[in-house]
Amino acid sequence: MQEYLEKRYALALYEIAEKNNKVDEYLRDLTDICDIFDENKEFYEVINHPKINTAKKKQLFTDLFKGKIDEELLSFMMILIEKDRILQLREILDQMEKIDLERRNTIRGIVKTVVPLLDEELEQLKAIFEKKYEKNILFDTKIDKSLLGGVYVKVGNDIIDGTIKSKVEEMKELMLKKE
């Protein structure tokens, strides 16, 4: 039920942002606000405190964000405070990012390697998956020394694990089965 509400809030906000041609701005601002929640425990505790009334919480947000974020985004935050859903902001942001990717015909993928890939290598991977999915691919690249070598790629439900670590684990399982 809660995820359903988060999707509805995200869709409503996305449509406002899209109408105002401010989708990227809203996503950036929401990310920054969520980071404030994560990094500032005192702020989080004030927002989460049951004895601090809604009016004070709204005033705190107004003082902090008025003039720094779009008025309609601030109004949206006020609604979340009134509905006692402001702490679901990260989930609403996640849903809004999914909506944005969908509307842009884009999906996210993960590429893990021991050393950074060259731009050409990343473009080749991207081209392969864009052809398969018929969508734009946005890769998050991560360096993972535990892989020992090779490459790990995850896009949607597809996983390509060409890492040395996975090959060693497969060999270990085979050897244990023979015993």
UniProtKB/Swiss-Prot annotation:
GO molecular function: proton-transporting ATP synthase activity, rotational mechanism
Localization terms from the record: Cell membrane
UniProt keyword Isomerase, yes or no: no
HAMAP family: ATP_synth_delta_bact
Keywords for this protein: ATP synthesis, Cell membrane, CF(1), Hydrogen ion transport, Ion transport, Membrane, Transport
Function: F(1)F(0) ATP synthase produces ATP from ADP in the presence of a proton or sodium gradient. F-type ATPases consist of two structural domains, F(1) containing the extramembraneous catalytic core and F(0) containing the membrane proton channel, linked together by a central stalk and a peripheral stalk. During catalysis, ATP synthesis in the catalytic domain of F(1) is coupled via a rotary mechanism of the central stalk subunits to proton translocation. This protein is part of the stalk that links CF(0) to CF(1). It either transmits conformational changes from CF(0) to CF(1) or is implicated in proton conduction.
Gene3D superfamilies reported for this sequence: N-terminal domain of the delta subunit of the F1F0-ATP synthase
Name under which the protein is recorded: ATP synthase subunit delta
Complex and partners: F-type ATPases have 2 components, F(1) - the catalytic core - and F(0) - the membrane proton channel. F(1) has five subunits: alpha(3), beta(3), gamma(1), delta(1), epsilon(1). F(0) has three main subunits: a(1), b(2) and c(10-14). The alpha and beta chains form an alternating ring which encloses part of the gamma chain. F(1) is attached to F(0) by a central stalk formed by the gamma and epsilon chains, while a peripheral stalk is formed by the delta and b chains.
Organism of origin: Clostridium beijerinckii (strain ATCC 51743 / NCIMB 8052) (Clostridium acetobutylicum)
Keyword Transport: yes
UniProt GO cellular component terms: plasma membrane; proton-transporting ATP synthase complex
Family label: Belongs to the ATPase delta chain family.
Upper classification of the organism: Bacteria, Bacillati, Bacillota, Clostridia, Eubacteriales
Topology of the protein relative to the lipid bilayer: Peripheral membrane protein
